[in-house]
Every structure is written in C-alpha cells, then in structure tokens.
Amino acid sequence: MITKKPTQGSQEQTAHAASKRMKKLSEYGKQLQEKQKVKNMYGVLEKQFRRFYKIAAKSQEAAGERLLSLLERRLDNTVYRLKLTISRAQARQIIVHGHVLVNGKKVYSPSFLVSINDEISLAPNVVSKTEFLERVVDKRLNIGVKVPEWLELNKKDRKGRVLRLPVRSDIQVPIEEHLIVELYSK
C-alpha cells in the first residue's frame, strides 16, 4: 500500500490561505470605520467633526441624527445637493473663491450652516461664465439627480432655497450613526 506524503506546496497553500482570511473587525474598528466613512463623505477634518458632534450631543434630539443634519446643512454640501457642482470638493472651492451667495451676500466659509429660507445662488461673475455653467451646472441638472426634499431649486435662475432642516430620512447613504455616537461617548 502506498501512502502519499503531503507535498511542500500544499503546506504553503494552507499557510497562504490563512493569511488571506479577513480578521473579524472589533467593535471599536467598526465605530472608527463608520466615523471615517462619514468624515470622508462630507470632506470634514477631525477637529471640525468633533465640534459638530459636541453641538449634536448637547441638543435634545438623538445625537447621531442631529450630527448628520448638521453635516447636511453645511454650505458646501448644500451647494452640492442643489446640483450646482459636481462634487463637494468643487463646491468648497467655489465657496472659498467667493462665487456663492447666501441671501445675496458672499460667503467664504464652506462650513457655514444654512438655515430655513436661506437662498443660495451663484455670484454674477460665475453666471456670466457660460463655460462653467454648461460644463458643470447644466450637465448635472440634466442627468436626473434629484434635489433632496429639504431644498428647492429654481433651474432657470440656478438658485436654491432651504425649505426645512434636513432629517435622517433625507440622507440616502447607508450610515450607522449610532456607531459614531458610541465612539465619541466613550
């Protein structure tokens, strides 16, 4: 009777397969991953994210929902949601350069929080640049991306208005905000 000896290659395969297995993520790892996902999505650095969390934690409503509402209300996010730019980074850039007006006044801070009935528009010098409008604004307006219910967009004038404050149901991205709250409440 012939018995087969395990070959050197089969031992290498099992050792290699073991290193490829995913390790189970710890609870802290899940919380950190969720926080990083939200920070990256909104383009916010840690210091400002923590500041928003402190504001959210002091409010009467659920801290996680309030945090997301505050992040949604940032001017750079609002300009992006109104489809006036292709990305939040581009929205941040045109805000810093003074190309966005809130209630007729230039605002240079992307972290500016919009309020109910605020009117957001592009500055006249941007509106006169048809290349930007054709390449960015009109293209985005025509691809069928919907403006959230908490905002109103006048496509003709390229102006938006805040109808109400955003709520959790307005955010379509799957976010487990309770993990972020657990992380910061330690």
Task: Tell what function each PLM region has.
Residues 1-82, 109-186:
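Ferredoxin-like alpha/beta domains used as RNA- or RNAP-binding modules
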Residues 85-88, 94-95, 114:
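Short, well-ordered loop/turn sites that connect or cap secondary structure elements
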Residues 89-93, 105-110:
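Short, surface-exposed recognition loops or helix-turn segments adjacent to catalytic cores
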